Each structure stands twice: as C-alpha cells, then as structure tokens.
Amino acid sequence: MTEKPTIAFAKFAAPKKGSVILLVPEGGNLGQAATAADPAGVMPKVFAAAEFKGKLAATVEALAPQGTAYDRVAVIGTGNPSALTEQSWLQIGGAAAAAAKNAGEVTVIADVAGLELSAREAANIGLGILLRSYVFDKYKTRRDENGIKARDKKFTIQCADPNAAKKAFAEASALGDGVYLARDLVNEPANVLGPVEFAAQAKALESLGVKVDVLTEREMKKLGMGALLGVAQGSVRPPRLVVMQWNGGKPKQKPVAFVGKGVVFDTGGISIKPAASMEDMKGDMAGAAAVVGLMHALAARKAKTNAVGIIGLVENMPDGNAQRPGDIVTSMSGQTIEIINTDAEGRLVLADALWYCKEQFKPQFMVNLATLTGAIIVALGNSHAGLFSNDDTLSERLTAAGQATGEKVWRMPLGSEYDKLIDTKNADMKNTGGRQAGSITAAQFLKRFVDDTPWAHLDVAGTAMGSPSSEINQSWASGFGVRLLDRLVADHYEG
C-alpha cells in the first residue's frame, strides 16, 4: 500500500519544532490555544496583509513569529461556523496536508474560536490529511518533486480530548486505508495488474479475517458463466471471480452484498476503442477496486455486519479467439445475450457476478459499482455517480450517504420504455441499446439479473478516475465508493 504519514493526537501545548497550523473561522479570530502559539500577536497583521478572511480551506503561510520555537506557520480558514459539515473537516485536513507539503514535523492546533471541536471532528481532520497525502509515485525514479515522503511526515493534532480523538481516528484510519488500497489498484498499470494479480491483492485481505475464495476459469465454466467468460476469451490472461466474506454480524444475519466490475484493461475488443486516451482503460476495474477497498475498511474497523464482496476480473482484448459482434452467449442465469458491441463488456461481467451473488448468498441487498458507460459522464459530469435502483429505500440511503461523505450520487430513471431497447429477435436480449439513453439501457440490462433482490447500480465512470482534483484527492484514481458504501453500512446495517 502507498506510504502514509503518521498522525497522532495530543493535548494543547506550545509547539517546539517544525511547522504549525492554526485554524480561524470566517471573519473571526484565533482561539485561545492558537493565540498561545502566537505570543507576539503578529498573525492578525498577517491576515490583514494577505486579505485573509477565513474562508473554508483558504490558507495563508508565514515564517514563525518571533519568540516561538517552531519554523513556519500556516493558517487555514474553517469558513462559516454554522455551515461546517463532516466534509468541511476533511477539506480542512486536506488543506493542512497541502500547506505542510515540505514539512516533516507538523502540529495542527485544532482550536477554533467559538467552537468546541468533537473527537470525531478532530479525527476527520486527520482523515483529510491522510486522503490528501496520497501520492502514487512508485514508478518514478526521481520523487523529490512531491516534497518530503509521506512515511517521513508526522502530524500531531492538538485537541481537547486526544484519547477520544485517537479512538475515533482508528476507524477513520481503517477507512482511509481502504481508500488508499482502491486508489492503488486503479492507478496500477495493467501490465502489472492482471486478473490473477488483482485476485492476489484481494486474497491478502485474509490477514484481516476476510474469507476469500478465488474461482478459476474452469470453475466458472462449470457454473455456466458464459457472459463473463465470453469477454475474457480474447485475452491470454485467465479470468477470475473473487468472493470475499466478512462475518462480523450475527451468525444467521443475511449479508449485505457489493459487486464490482473488474476489467483490468479494456481495449474494446473487436469493437476496438480509439487510440486517444485508451491508456485510461487500465482503470476500468475501479468498481472492483472500490469493493476490495470497502471490504478492507469493514474488516479493519471490525464492522458489526455480514458483508459479501464479489468481483469479476477479466481483460478485454481483440485477438483471434476474441468474442465477435453477432455472437450469442448464455449467462449463468440461463438467459441468452446477443453481442452487438464487444465494448459493452462490463455489463456481461456483472450479469454473471450479480446472478452468482443472488443465488449463492440471498443478500439483504446488492450494490454493484462499475465504470460502465461514457453516457453517464455526458449526463452527470464528474461530480455525481449515476444511481439506478429497483428499491426506493436503498436508493434514499445511498443518496444520504453520498451527501454525508461527499461521494455524491444522482438517481436516474428505469422503466419498460427503456427495457425494450435491449430486446432482440435473436436472443433474450442484446448487450447494448444503441446511442440513446446509454447509461439507462445498461442499467436495464443489469436489472434482468437481480430478480426481486433490492439492488442498486452505481455507474462511477465519471467519478472513479480522472476526476478534478479536490482538497482530499490529487490522484488520478479517487477511490470513489469506499467511503460512500462504508457510510451506508455504518448508518443502516450494523449491530
């Protein structure tokens, strides 16, 4: 896993070395503990000179005031005190990490005038620091442009109750590790991370108590997974289906289930993609990466739930054995599918994975994640994932979790008028409905493989990779879905 900084918590005390970060509300002043770190009272003059107003995540930096033992100081705005949310504290932590890029020892004085920060808020500052500190540079031979290495950095967050904050951060850190893992998997080049290697990364979760089974091509053939195997047949790299189980709930409690599309590289197959930006298709397994990251987070924080994670891992290549347009395959469900476009392959992988999950585990619900369609980017851009669901309660809970974490979703329609667009004379269905409503017809296709199980499909093509940089992510891979689904579980399916 990518290196992380050390994050600790302590009581308020005068900083003795390194860099110091102070927090100031919009239009406000330094808090009592922060004021003690500025004995000469020079920071208000710095604010005035820099026209610093305390806007959320705004930053001003200066040399340490005379008479202090530390080297540099940065002040970060916390914005309007009445508008602060969980996301705000993550952003503040991210701004702190950015301000301390070239510092080894950093003290964050989590004291805001007029506010009493909770342990959870202090922990979220730490999580924001963790998320912003992620840098994927393992293949760079010269890494100095990224400042001091994360492993050599230590952030000490001073707060009112450091013991409670440390306890809260233990869970937050587990979540951060899950995001790091998902980002690592998506950022990894496809020549390094094939289906077998990806499965090995998931298998490593056994060290956390996750039960992991890896189904081979032969085992999938016995199960009748013709849809998934049809995608894989053009690659010399064999496919895998990985089944992860975390049993932290009651013995007879039905599990919650998460299914991820894991196309480790997508050329489009015989319906080959244009060359421009094809390198980004190493990230066409971001849905599977999020599921692995989520299972890591649930296990690491000892979530009191039973959860199943299933990922279908294939490579879509155009060799002489590759699937052709016009082919008809039989899915595990027994339903037949006419292949119209071999670049609509992710839904074929998910069709068998969803059916296997439904039949094998009878879960409370299934949520699948997939970088499924470019159409969802046209519809929603990069700020929301597309949400399609057959269950209003599940949809509402996902939407609320998205608002809380900042990993936002937007519900899209489903209906018979869209479903008929994937009908065909030659088989039970075809794998694409054409240009119109492309993300919706893809979801309608998946819906045919879930029966009455409560289900949601998250199309994360616009949010999982190549999204705009933010206060908590500067990486090409965002790890989208890990925090969203962890919150869904924590709020509704534990205990």
Swiss-Prot record:
Cellular component GO terms held in the UniProt record: cytoplasm
Function: Presumably involved in the processing and regular turnover of intracellular proteins. Catalyzes the removal of unsubstituted N-terminal amino acids from various peptides.
Protein name: Probable cytosol aminopeptidase
One Pfam match: Peptidase_M17_N
Co-factor note (free text): Binds 2 manganese ions per subunit.
Residues the entry annotates as binding Mn(2+) 2: K261, D266, D284, E345
EC number per UniProt: 3.4.11.1, 3.4.11.10
Chief place where the protein resides: cytoplasm
HAMAP family, alphabetized: Cytosol_peptidase_M17
InterPro entries on file: Leucine_aapep/pepB, Macro_dom-like, Peptidase_M17_C, Peptidase_M17_leu_NH2_pept, Peptidase_M17_N
Matching NCBIfam families: PRK00913.1-2, PRK00913.1-4, PRK00913.2-2, PRK00913.2-4, PRK00913.3-5
PROSITE patterns named among the record's database cross-references: CYTOSOL_AP
MF terms in GO: manganese ion binding; metalloaminopeptidase activity
Keywords, alphabetical: Aminopeptidase, Cytoplasm, Hydrolase, Manganese, Metal-binding, Protease
Active site per UniProt: K273, R347
Any one of the GO BP annotations: proteolysis
Annotated Mn(2+) 1 binding sites: D266, D343, E345
Subcellular compartments: Cytoplasm
Cofactor(s) listed: Mn(2+)
The family this protein is said to belong to: Belongs to the peptidase M17 family.
Reaction it catalyzes: Release of an N-terminal amino acid, Xaa-|-Yaa-, in which Xaa is preferably Leu, but may be other amino acids including Pro although not Arg or Lys, and Yaa may be Pro. Amino acid amides and methyl esters are also readily hydrolyzed, but rates on arylamides are exceedingly low; Release of an N-terminal amino acid, preferentially leucine, but not glutamic or aspartic acids
